């Protein structure tokens, strides 16, 4: 996808002395006392801000935090803790500016944090009045927030329509490149792992991927519904019997293309859903009426691992079992290790997937780890994200 990149503007000296407005994703979790409990997103925003400062720009940064009521800023909605953390990471003062829509004082070489953008009236609905006011604040607009790229809001879309220059920051550029590499021009075979508790939440993804991928590996509650579609008994496992026909349609669509949905041949079951429930490996044809399927079995895990090691590209969204329980983590662990050992380009995303990657320490062995939950899922659904669309439009005339 052709877009203007902020790194190129900086390299060409076009940001010197310019007012740069960066939309970052600084929406971090906090405890009841307002202390930041996990700062990955803040750390991830630093390279773009530093790039702008090093280029001699006057830098404004904003983000949303939570879901505030438009027009009202409460202490809980304030970016004050984020400003403090940013100043530590950047090694310079980062003043926090409230009521900033009508004007911001900032000099080249300085950075200010503009208070929670979702407090501004018109942000969520992307009103032209707000977008035009924000565009007047800057010479260059930079979107570096992939996590909100699927939302057409004032700071993610509207401002990009009216700003003199609209471009992508390093984080957003990396996401665009990785997604293109995995889905637009993938090295074959292309394997996708789509797992989770419900087919209903991922049905669009399953359908979209079924005409692109060579192997569509399903896991978790989704796999149980596919096992029902294949005529297997799943006992009292979590599934959606009303979506069996949809699962069958995905299986048939894949088969018609010479591709496959590998159905588990063995599973790990228990009688209750608990960490200390005795785990039993069974053939997929031997599941009893009172069994709960909580993981794929070793035979299935080995087969899938072999497929992943032979893949050219891997897309991973979701653990294949209840990996939080040691007795039912082996399937997800085997998948994670196979991805780590595979020469394939891999892209992974989604909260549980990131937790599994961290648990098995394979961060450095995954080609690209996507930070955007909902945005990543919409890409897998085959949608063009609003933030990508407007930057592409601006870059092409």
UniProtKB/Swiss-Prot annotation:
Principal subcellular localisation of the protein: cytoplasm
Alphabetized Pfam families for the sequence: PGK
Record-listed E.C. numbers: 2.7.2.3
Enzyme class: transferase
Alphabetic keyword roster: ATP-binding, Cytoplasm, Glycolysis, Kinase, Nucleotide-binding, Transferase
Annotated binding of substrate, by residue: 25-27, 41, 64-67, 118, 151
Subcellular location as annotated: Cytoplasm
Catalytic reaction equation(s): (2R)-3-phosphoglycerate + ATP = (2R)-3-phospho-glyceroyl phosphate + ADP
One GO cellular component, as annotated: cytosol
GO biological process: gluconeogenesis; glycolytic process
Family: Belongs to the phosphoglycerate kinase family.
Subunit note: Monomer.
Full protein name: Phosphoglycerate kinase
Organism: Paracidovorax citrulli (strain AAC00-1)
Gene this protein is translated from: pgk
């Amino acid at each position: 996808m052709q877009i203007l990149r902020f790194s190129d503007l900086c390299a060409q000296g076009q940001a010197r002395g310019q007012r740069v407005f960066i939309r970052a994703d600084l929406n971090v979790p906090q405890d009841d006392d307002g202390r930041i409990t996990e700062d990955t997103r803040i750390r991830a925003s630093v390279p773009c801000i530093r790039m702008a400062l090093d280029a001699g720009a006057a830098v404004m940064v904003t983000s949303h935090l939570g879901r505030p009521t438009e027009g009202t800023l409460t202490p809980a909605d304030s970016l004050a803790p984020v400003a403090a953390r940013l100043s530590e990471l950047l090694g310079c003062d980062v003043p926090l500016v409230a009521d900033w829509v009508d004007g911001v004082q900032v000099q080249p070489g300085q950075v200010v944090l503009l208070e929670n953008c979702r407090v501004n009236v018109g942000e969520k609905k992307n009103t032209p009045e707000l977008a035009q006011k924000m565009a007047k604040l800057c010479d260059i607009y930079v979107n570096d927030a992939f996590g909100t790229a699927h939302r057409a809001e004032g700071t993610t879309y509207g401002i990009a329509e009216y700003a003199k220059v609209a471009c992508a920051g390093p984080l957003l550029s990396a996401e665009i490149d990785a997604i293109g590499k995995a889905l637009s021009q993938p090295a074959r075979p292309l394997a996708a792992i789509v797992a989770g508790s419900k087919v209903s939440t991922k049905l669009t993804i399953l359908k979209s991927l079924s005409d692109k991928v060579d192997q569509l590996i399903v896991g978790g509650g989704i796999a149980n519904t596919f096992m029902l579609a294949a005529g297997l008994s799943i006992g009292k496992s979590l599934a959606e019997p009303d979506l069996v026909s949809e699962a069958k349609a995905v299986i048939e669509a894949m088969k018609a293309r010479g591709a496959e949905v590998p159905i588990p041949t063995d599973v790990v079951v228990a009688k209750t859903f608990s960490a200390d429930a005795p785990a039993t490996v069974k053939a997929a044809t031997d599941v009893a009426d009172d069994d709960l399927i909580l993981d794929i079995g070793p035979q299935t895990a080995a087969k899938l691992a072999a497929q992943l090691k032979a893949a050219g590209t891997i897309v991973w969204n979701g653990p294949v079992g209840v990996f939080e329980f040691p007795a039912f983590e082996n399937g997800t662990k085997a998948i994670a290790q196979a991805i780590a050992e595979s020469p394939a380009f891999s892209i992974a995303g989604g909260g549980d997937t990131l937790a599994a990657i961290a648990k098995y320490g394979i961060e450095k062995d995954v080609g690209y780890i996507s930070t955007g939950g909902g945005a990543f899922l919409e890409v897998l659904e085959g949608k063009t994200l609003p933030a990508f669309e407007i930057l592409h439009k601006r870059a092409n005339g």
